[in-house]
Amino acid sequence: MSKFVFDSMLPKYPQFQPFISSHHLTTTPPNSSSAAVAAALAAAAASASASVSASSSSNNNSSNTIAGSNTSNTNNSSSSPSSSSNNNSNLNLSGGSLSPSHLSQHLGQSPHSPVSSSSPFQQHHPQVQQQHLNHQQQQHLHHQQQQHHHQYSSLSAALQLQQQQHHISKLAAAAVASHGHAHQQLLLTPPSAGNSQAGDSSCSPSPSASGSSSLHRSLNDNSPGSASASASASAASSVAAAAAAAAAAASSSFAIPTSKMYPYVSNHPSSHGGLSGMAGFTGLEDKSCSRYTDTVMNSYQSMSVPASASAQFAQFYQHATAAASAVSAASAGAIGVDSLGNACTQPASGVMPGAGGAGGAGIADLPRYPWMTLTDWMGSPFERVVCGDFNGPNGCPRRRGRQTYTRFQTLELEKEFHFNHYLTRRRRIEIAHALCLTERQIKIWFQNRRMKLKKELRAVKEINEQARRDREEQEKMKAQETMKSAQQNKQVQQQQQQQQQQQQQQQQQHQQQQQQPQDHHSIIAHNPGHLHHSVVGQNDLKLGLGMGVGVGVGGIGPGIGGGLGGNLGMMSALDKSNHDLLKAVSKVNS
């Protein structure tokens, strides 16, 4: 097959490109007339489309090769007439790019042919001119062939670059698939002390390194000889190195650790088995907390990678700066994202300053307590609400479920609140780690607890105020009762005093009455006749009798009946006393 056939097949069948760029197709054999015709036609087409600057720059490069080809053509023409006639036919067919005068001269036969030697019009001067024209035509032909060779070499380099980029994309996809498979195996198989060192193969960029080495081998094997091909090969090698670095960073699950606050807490419970057998990680299963990721924990495993793997890492880090942010975001989304979206975002670079290459010996002095062992809380109603669908039936977000705390968490929070009503940032972080809660939950719990305490104090204050008001009312009632009782006592005392006064008056009257009969007895004892007569006289006067003259004994003169009216008023007042006197007289007489 000829080069022209491959040139026509190149756009449809790019797989024939390595055969076109090989050396045995670029040079045509001198004894093949069809190959010479095809090469001449291809050279003419290439010379018509080539630029002037490219032709001028390549003239100096092709001067030595033209001279060698000229001598070879001369020898061929002298040795074989058929080859010279073939060369002349090539020159005549490719003369479309020359001037018309040259074309008219090229129509003649070669002087070495038998027809031209038998011509009677041939002279010596036209033969020299014909040789000079042949020499120029051969130079131009070789120059066009060299330009055509450069064009095909640049085209082959571009095709090689495209194939290499396709190969790079395939390698990157394979690396990503292997990374996903390795991550699934890491999550499904619990690590142990034995396979922690064997798990370094997941960290090492062996697939990417092998892919990059194969790329460099293919570049060295298929590299063209031109300057443009070497430049494209160097660009392809840089692109391949960058893609291999990105694939290595994506394939290693521990390349770029995400920033977390608590590096000693892991997301997956099975990841504590391998770390507990390492130095400085004894008993980490007591601190198992399902709320935090295992990215930084697994970074301590990557610290124990051997020196050879570290050297393999170092050769890719200089090209991975552009893809580091995207790979870190992808690894953070694929490995460790909190289910609530509120994981700590503080940098973890300053948290573990004493972590060594042998496996984090700086964490050995962390305090561990029995109450740090927590039960699984993933089955709580709060988790079902949070991890479920937030969108309601009308498209609005559902109301977030109420946070439920375990009895242990509530007890520890109450203990802390008993001593401190307000927490510092450091203490809040410690409690959040110990109770497997976030700082926001701790802060909200303390706010609610302070509000609850405020309400309790307000209720106690109201109760005390009510009790005080009750006491005041009772005191008022007691005061009123005492006043009433005092008034009653006063009244009773007044009544008693009145009774006593009455009794005293009665006693005085009785005494007076007793004294009066004694005096009357004494009078009657001395003058009984006089008393008898006075009483009888008084009775007579009281009856209003108009008797004659009464004789008075003891110095009493005779009364006149005319003075009875005046004596009646006095007798009415002395009626009582006289009655008593009559009784006394009757007693005495008896």
Curated annotation (Swiss-Prot):
A motif (Antp-type hexapeptide) lies at residues 368-373. It is found in: Nucleus. Pfam families: Abdominal-A (PF12407), Homeodomain (PF00046). Keywords: Developmental protein, DNA-binding, Homeobox, Nucleus. Residues 53-101, 109-139, 196-214, 487-517 have a biased composition (Low complexity). Residues 398-457 bind DNA. Its main location: nucleus. SUPFAM superfamilies: Homeodomain-like. GO terms for biological process: anterior/posterior pattern specification; apoptotic process; cardiac muscle tissue development; cardioblast differentiation; determination of genital disc primordium; dorsal vessel heart proper cell fate commitment; genital disc anterior/posterior pattern formation; genitalia development. InterPro entries: Abdominal-A, Antp_homeobox, HD, HD_metazoa, Homeobox_CS, Homeodomain-like_sf. Belongs to the Antp homeobox family. This is Homeobox protein abdominal-A. It comes from Drosophila melanogaster. The lineage of its organism: Eukaryota, Metazoa, Ecdysozoa, Arthropoda, Hexapoda.
